[in-house]
């Protein structure tokens, strides 16, 4: 249906001299699988009429509870990180455009503080991917600004608090300046986990007592890495025909305990990658009931008891190799005979899995895997950081420098920022401001128009939704002598260390005129 609709839209646009772009808004494969929904999203990527995707990741999807270390709970940042990564990797080999979505609220009835905390987590997670710089920032704005939601700790409902709308608008405005870059997130690169569309087909119903609580076979492969500060990559099996899929990948973890290969050809690409030097780690007992469904590996003359037997045979192994390490060409195959769900369902049961990966990485790359409890990425003047709980350390992360705190509505200037486990930080690095800039609104809760800079003055028009408060940090060459907001003189709140002026006034969608003289 989408093929017909998008093709018609493009042809109609062409007849009118318009180049119409068509994007598919979709949840991630992770979320659809978790929520037991089947979607054709990956197959749509190959349609010529599809220009890209809108990755619908927000608090509502990212807060789906999962298991780690035997504990089931919400892990919003970690889940969002994996969801955005899943969407990014789905389109990367095809070079399709990707928009990342965040939502300051969600459909479930929670309170404003809950929305704020989880918005920060998903917002930070999306910025961890420097190859994406296009965003959908506010689905259904009327719901955000006019909806009534609970005040934390009470049964009372109110519209969005001024403090939250100010912070949210400041965060959204920064995305106008975010650009793609070659900068990488901190942590050991090149470790991936294989996914496939068939993940969605194994979620329901349970058979013969075999189950996969909260999609634990997937999280068993990913969370033991992510929680140790490794930015695990997700690799889509449907993309293995593209060489770009394996670029920079050193180790690939896979399991057929919760998915199956829909085509035997995928094994050719996996085996070829191993033969050229890749390390493939297979985790699984191959005992789930879906191993015996009538499929290509056990029909039309094929007599494999499990699809993994076909893969192992491709790599000159026996059909059912025991646990151990095997060579194939220049590469390595490591077999672990345990379904990965057990790595997270049982407390402390992921150590052997992690040590297997760490040892394989050290042997292949000649260096140790870096373990830590945080991720940091720098994008221009913006520093994004996340510190995880349930990790290798309970220590906070301390960043030193000269920063504006973008997760604080008052935009304070800091020389040190401490981020606790389970929290995230978003900072404007003032030391990265170009010396060529004389005067500029660095950040704030309104959009800036009609900027005019002269030798001794700076003026602009600020626009933002009604019934919200603007707070802005304005870079100036020196302390101002006169400030006017809509003609009314204001007293300066000046920070000498950063050479910035703090401005605050009532927003107006028609525009607020600001003039500054020094």
Where are these regions (language model features)?
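Active-site neighborhood of glycoside hydrolase catalytic domains
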Residues: 1-22
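A short helix->loop->beta-strand "cap" motif at the edges of active sites that frequently abuts
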Residues: 17-20, 94-96, 275-279, 331
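Hydrophobic targeting/anchoring helices
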Residues: 22-218, 319-322, 334-338, 343-347, ...
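A short, well-structured beta->alpha microelement
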Residues: 222-245
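Short, well-ordered secondary-structure micro-motifs within conserved domains or adaptor modules
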Residues: 246-259
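A conserved amphipathic helix/loop scaffold
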Residues: 260-457, 461, 472-473
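Solvent-exposed beta-strand/loop surfaces of large extracellular or lumenal domains
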Residues: 400-417, 484-504
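Surface-exposed interaction regions enriched in Ser/Thr/Asp/Glu
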Residues: 504-518
């Amino acid at each position: 249906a989408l093929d017909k609709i998008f093709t018609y839209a493009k042809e109609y646009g062409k007849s009118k001299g318009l180049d119409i772009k068509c994007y598919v808004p979709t949840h991630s494969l992770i979320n659809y699988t978790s929520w037991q929904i089947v979607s054709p999203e990956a197959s749509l990527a190959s349609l010529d009429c599809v220009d890209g995707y809108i990755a619908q990741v927000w608090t509502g999807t990212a807060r789906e509870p999962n298991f780690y270390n035997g504990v089931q709970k919400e892990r919003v940042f970690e889940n969002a990180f994996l969801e955005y990564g899943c969407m990014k990797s789905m389109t990367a080999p095809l070079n399709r455009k990707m928009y990342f979505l965040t939502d300051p609220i969600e459909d479930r009835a929670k309170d404003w503080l809950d929305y704020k905390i989880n918005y920060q987590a998903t917002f930070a997670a999306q910025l961890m991917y420097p190859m994406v710089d296009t965003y959908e920032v506010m689905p259904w704005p009327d719901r955000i600004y006019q909806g009534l939601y609970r005040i934390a700790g009470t049964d009372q409902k109110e519209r969005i608090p001024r403090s939250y709308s100010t912070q949210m608008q400041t965060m959204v405005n920064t995305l106008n300046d975010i650009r793609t870059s070659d900068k990488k997130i901190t942590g050991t690169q090149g470790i991936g986990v294989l996914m496939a569309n068939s993940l969605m087909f194994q979620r329901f119903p349970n058979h013969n007592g075999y189950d996969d609580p909260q999609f634990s076979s997937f999280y068993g492969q990913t969370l033991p890495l992510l929680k140790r500060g490794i930015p695990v990559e997700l690799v889509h099996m449907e993309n293995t025909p593209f060489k770009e899929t394996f670029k920079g990948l050193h180790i690939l973890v896979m399991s057929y305990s919760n998915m199956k290969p829909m085509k035997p050809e995928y094994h050719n690409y996996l085996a070829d990658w191993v033969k050229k030097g890749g390390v493939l780690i297979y985790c699984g007992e191959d005992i789930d009931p879906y191993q015996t469904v009538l499929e290509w590996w056990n029909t039309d003359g094929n007599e494999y008891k499990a699809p993994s037997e076909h893969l192992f045979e491709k790599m000159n192994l026996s059909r059912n190799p025991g646990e151990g390490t095997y060579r194939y060409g220049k590469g390595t195959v490591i077999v672990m005979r345990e379904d990965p769900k057990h790595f997270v369902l049982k407390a402390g049961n992921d150590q052997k899995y992690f040590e297997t990966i760490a040892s394989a990485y050290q042997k292949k790359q000649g260096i140790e895997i870096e373990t830590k409890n945080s991720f940091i990425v720098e994008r221009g003047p913006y520093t994004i950081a996340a510190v995880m709980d349930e990790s290798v350390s309970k220590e906070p992360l301390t960043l030193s420098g000269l920063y504006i705190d973008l997760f604080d509505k008052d935009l304070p200037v800091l020389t040190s920022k401490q981020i606790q486990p389970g929290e995230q930080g978003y900072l404007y690095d003032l030391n990265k401001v170009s010396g060529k800039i004389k005067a500029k609104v660095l950040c704030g809760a309104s959009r800036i128009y009609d900027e005019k800079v002269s030798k001794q003055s700076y003026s602009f028009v600020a626009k933002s939704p009604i019934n919200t408060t603007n707070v802005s940090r304005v870079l100036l060459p020196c302390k101002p002598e006169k400030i006017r907001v809509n003609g009314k003189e204001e007293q300066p709140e000046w920070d000498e260390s950063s050479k910035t002026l703090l401005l605050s006034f009532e927003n107006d969608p028609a525009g607020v005129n600001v003039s500054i003289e020094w």
